[in-house]
Amino acid sequence: MKKILLLSDTHGHVDDHMMKYVNQSDEVWHAGDIGTTQVTETISSLKPIRAVFGNIDNHELRLSFPEELLFECEEINIYMTHIGGRPGRYAKGISEKIKSIKPKIFICGHSHILKIQYDKVNQLLFINPGAIGKHGFHKVRTMVRFEIDKSDIKNMEVIEVKR
């Protein structure tokens, strides 16, 4: 079993509240718009991190992280990218990719809008953790944590932080 902390859109921001949850996880997944290498260096000094770059990320971050990640955690296939849209309105090329690779979880960021939804059409769990950084229009900063136990996704929780 693995405890996962999922975050996105840090835009260079790291704070003690976020790091408290990093410490409680086994792995941290970042869905892009990291902002600075300090973010990933701080997290990876404590826990393994899987990340994709986002549209605001500089050349250095784009060299360090891919635009999309396809990986397996326990017995679950995951597809993560920064700009993904949402069920019923996926970004260009995403629907085709999902149909091709058939992930059990699809993760994206970009919108700063927290959304967790089962996509019945593609039979996957869609997760956008919202934004944990301070830049943007969002009024509440959010992260998502959950556990993966073999082929089960459980104990999903939204963590809200005041701006």
Locations of regions flagged by a protein language model:
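Active-site environment of divalent metal-dependent phosphoester hydrolases
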Residues: 12-16, 34-39, 56-62, 85-90, ...
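N-terminal active-site segment of His-dependent metallophosphoesterases
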Residues: 1-49, 57-67, 73-77, 139-142
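Active-site-proximal segments of metal-dependent phosphoesterases and phosphodiesterases across multiple
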Residues: 57-101, 134
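Redox-cofactor binding/interface segments in oxidoreductases and associated redox assembly factors
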Residues: 29-30, 81, 108
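Conserved beta-sheet core of the metallophosphoesterase superfamily
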Residues: 50, 89-152
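Beta-strand-turn-beta hairpins that frame and shape the catalytic cleft
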Residues: 1-5, 70-79, 119-125, 148-157
